[in-house]
């Protein structure tokens, strides 16, 4: 293992509407209703957090630090506290100053600055956020850093030669790739199952400090103004319930009614 680098892992996390909540379009038809709705960590990011902690637990001498960062409102402190309770070393909250829907490219640019500031050499992040499903922030970050990337990771291994082997899921099965650090890895659902955190650890995490940054003050060179505008949004049309048919003749009659035949 002499060829292995000390790992400084960065894990970006996002606060999103809880995955168990059915999203509803707001009254202005410009987005999702967020008032009175439960929020939690993006499930794919939670998997990235778990993987970072597991890597540290398996390779204590290999991991120098694990750091989680969230870009959003002050309310994102809750998910960062959860990260600390699970075992992440330190956290940063980058206040978006009222800008809730920062686009992926701007997020990637901010994360690039964080990587450079923290000296990170491995970024573990969810392959996508469940609110916008963009699935491109990790790729953009890797491009900006000029680092290799492994997306949709289902397994991550550190080889004795210092390289990282990632098994990723593709349409036809699995693909195994290798790369050298530094690199960006985006996580898929099958990578692991995040651990449950008990109340004592959550209470203890509340006493830990969270670094507070401000987009306007600490990243003034990055334009966070949206390049796209949501013109309108609507919920999918409700499908009519299915009908149980007892014979082929009934099926034919129903098809004739809807003029399918």
Curated annotation (Swiss-Prot):
Signal peptide per UniProt: none
Keyword terms, alphabetized: Acetylation, Electron transport, FAD, Flavoprotein, Mitochondrion, Transport
Annotated CDD domains: ETF_beta (cd01714)
Cellular compartments per GO CC: mitochondrial matrix; mitochondrion
Residue positions, PTM N-acetylserine: 2
Major location (coarse): mitochondrion
Cofactor: binding comment: Binds 1 FAD per dimer.
One GO molecular-function entry: electron transfer activity
SMART domains registered for this protein in UniProt: ETF
Cofactor: FAD; AMP
A GO BP entry: fatty acid beta-oxidation using acyl-CoA dehydrogenase
Self-association and partners: Heterodimer of an alpha and a beta subunit. Interacts with YFH1.
Family as reported in the entry's similarity comment: Belongs to the ETF beta-subunit/FixA family.
Other notes: Present with 2400 molecules/cell in log phase SD medium.
Job description of the protein: The electron transfer flavoprotein serves as a specific electron acceptor for several dehydrogenases, including five acyl-CoA dehydrogenases, glutaryl-CoA and sarcosine dehydrogenase. It transfers the electrons to the main mitochondrial respiratory chain via ETF-ubiquinone oxidoreductase (ETF dehydrogenase).
Name of the protein described by the UniProt record: Probable electron transfer flavoprotein subunit beta
Organism in which the protein naturally occurs: Saccharomyces cerevisiae (strain ATCC 204508 / S288c)
Gene it is expressed from: CIR1
């Amino acid at each position: 293992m002499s060829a292995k680098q000390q790992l400084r892992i960065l894990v970006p996390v996002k606060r999103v509407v809880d995955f168990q909540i059915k999203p509803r379009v707001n009254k202005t038809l410009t987005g999702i209703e967020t008032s009175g709705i439960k929020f939690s960590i993006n499930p794919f990011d939670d998997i990235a957090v778990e993987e970072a902690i597991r890597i540290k637990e398996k390779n204590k001498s290999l991991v120098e630090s694990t750091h989680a960062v969230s870009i959003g409102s002050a309310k994102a402190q809750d998910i960062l506290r959860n990260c600390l309770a699970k075992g992440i070393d330190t956290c940063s909250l980058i206040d978006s100053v009222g800008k809730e829907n920062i686009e992926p490219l701007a997020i990637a640019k901010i994360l690039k600055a964080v990587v450079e500031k923290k000296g990170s050499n491995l970024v573990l992040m969810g392959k996508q956020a469940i609110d916008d499903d963009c699935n491109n922030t990790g790729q953009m970050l890797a491009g900006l850093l000029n680092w290799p990337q492994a997306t949709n990771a289902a397994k991550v291994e550190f080889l004795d030669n210092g390289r990282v082997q990632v098994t990723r899921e593709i349409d036809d099965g699995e693909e195994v790739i290798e790369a050298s650090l530094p690199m960006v890895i985006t996580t898929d659902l099958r990578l692991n199952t995040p651990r449950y955190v008990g109340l004592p650890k959550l209470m203890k995490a509340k006493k830990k400090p969270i670094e507070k940054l401000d987009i306007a003050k600490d990243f003034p060179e990055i334009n966070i103004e949206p390049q796209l505008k949501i013109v309108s949004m609507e919920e999918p049309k409700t499908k009519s319930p299915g009908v149980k048919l007892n014979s082929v003749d009934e099926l034919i009659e129903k098809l004739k009614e809807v003029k399918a035949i």
